[in-house]
Amino acid sequence: MTSRRFSQVDVFTTTPYAGNPVAVVLDAEELDVETMQRFARWTNLSETTFLLPAQDPSADYRLRIFTPARELPFAGHPTLGSCHAWLQSGGVPGDPGTVVQECGAGLVQVRRTDTGLAFAAPPLLRSGPVDVELVAHVADVLRIDQTAIMDTQWVDNGPGWLGVLLHSAEAVLALQPGVVDLDIGVVGMHPAGSLDALEVRAFFPIDGRTVEDPVTGSLNASLAGWLTSTGRATTPYTARQGTVLGRLGRVQVTRDDGGTIWTGGAAVTCVHGHVEL
């Protein structure tokens, strides 16, 4: 085993222990996939990441992202938390204004903002309408009547999200889902004039049970593309997530002059030290 630098970063919050944590191994050279997956299972966080030297010359580093069950090509809060840890540990980007992350989904740009960091999400792996039969199944596992669903859309930019729009933020907060068998992101609008525009919840299966993710960058990024393209949301806006779990997650969504959607927020380091791997 080797002593490797390690950080645990809370993402999408300014308050430690109130966002979504990610475990970051900063010196992951020579670790095999089995060791990475075993460590991710041991941390039991929604994601654990491993920083490696970039293979693409235009990237600043390469990132591998693991849930307790599998590797992901991309995920949002691990991207921001890992970038935060890399910068805090002395990482210097080739371009002072932008960090370039290499991952399974390709190259992802991360930039500093007034509130922390923001990423430009990679293209969707799957989009478009959801089959009627699957919509009925989603309503069943969410334990709601199908008429409560305003719209659905595939919004998969890596983890596999299926987006579900309900009539209100209140309806989202009231959800008590059963056992889900796919990754479901649910969103509803807060009343006009509210500090937060959207309420978001994310559910996914692990070992036959339903897990709710505290705050989800990838989902918020893909929801932003869907909701802004259909005129249901206008950037800039803030989405709230983790409320039911007692978290204070806030996700800022903006669009630049070129039409790129940036998804971001604050990050704070809660644990820093070394891990034996």
Predicted regions and their residues:
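Active-site proximal loop and beta-alpha junction motif in alpha/beta enzyme cores
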Residues: 1-74, 80-277
